[in-house]
Design a protein with these regions (language model features):
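A generic alpha-to-beta junction signature in SAM-dependent methyltransferases
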Residues: 55-57, 80-81, 155
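A short SAM/SAH-binding and catalytic strip from SAM-dependent methyltransferases
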Residues: 131-144
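Conserved alpha-helix/loop element of class I SAM-dependent methyltransferases that forms part
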Residues: 42-61, 76
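A short glycine-rich, Lys/Arg-flanked "PGG" loop and its adjoining helix->strand segment in the class I
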Residues: 145-157
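C-terminal alpha-helical "lid/dimerization" subdomain adjacent to the S-adenosyl-L-methionine
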Residues: 15-41, 45, 160-218
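A short acidic, Gly/Pro-enriched loop at the edge of an enzyme's catalytic core
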Residues: 120-131
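Class I SAM-dependent methyltransferase SAM/SAH-binding core
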Residues: 62-121
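Single conserved hydrophobic/aromatic residue that forms the stacking wall/gate
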Residues: 1-13
Length: 221
């Protein structure tokens, strides 16, 4: 019985350790957080590529990538907007530092900066950006309409908000993540579109990859 008890305790500890590690998807912290940002950069690459294929970007655009994680999508934006400027924002210090590291050359050239900030109170003036992107992050946003309204505020007139999620809310298997990660909520495209409309977006296009249960939404101010 002692062996059984210690085995059960070990299983609980392992489960808790795994859950602690996956909490880093919400807010990367410490060494586990650094590791997670690198995993995000590689693990989300195909999704990001697909999401980016749904928009065309002006080469001189002013861009904000919210929830920038490890900074890989900042790098893609920089490549697409060679004469523009890209800002990354995340509420995790680890993510900010990792994104700065990955995009150090562009930061040195004055084409990029990465800031710590909260999407429910974006630290920028009205009508600052041509594009705002959110890859694999809206699951964790505290109140969609409020956060989407903030995105709407910082976008210029006819500015574009790109959302990209690898869970479309129709795959029961994805619910395991909401049990594992505190504060995570998976939305359907219908729910996202309703919140975007309420936040003041006018033209909203949805794209889906049914095979992978991916969704991408392009909303115009």
């Amino acid at each position: 019985s002692t062996l059984l008890a210690s085995s059960a305790a070990s299983d609980v500890y392992k489960r808790q350790s795994v859950m602690r590690f996956f909490e880093n998807t919400r807010k990367p912290q410490g060494f586990g957080g650094k590791l997670m940002t690198k995993m995000m950069n590689s693990g989300h690459a195909k999704l990001s590529q697909w999401g980016f294929s749904n928009i065309s970007a002006k080469s001189d655009a002013e861009v904000l990538d919210v929830g920038c994680g490890g900074g890989a999508n900042i790098a893609v934006w920089l490549d697409r907007c060679r004469n523009g400027h890209v800002t990354g924002m995340d509420y995790s210090r680890v993510s900010v530092a990792e994104s700065q590291k990955l995009n150090a050359a562009a930061i040195k050239q004055g084409k990029c900066n990465v800031v710590q900030g909260d999407v429910s109170a974006i630290p920028f003036s009205d009508a600052t950006f041509d594009y705002v992107s959110a890859f694999e992050t809206v699951y964790f946003w505290p109140g969609l309409v409020k956060c989407f309204s903030e995105v709407n505020r910082v976008l210029k007139s006819e500015g574009i908000f790109l959302i990209c999620n690898e869970s479309d809310g129709t795959n029961a298997a994805d619910e395991k993540w909401t049990k594992m990660i505190n504060g995570m909520k998976i939305y359907t495209s219908k729910q996202l579109v309703a919140a975007l409309k309420e936040a003041g977006f006018t033209e909203i296009k949805t794209y889906s990859n049914a095979k992978n249960h991916w969704i991408s939404i392009v909303a115009t101010k």
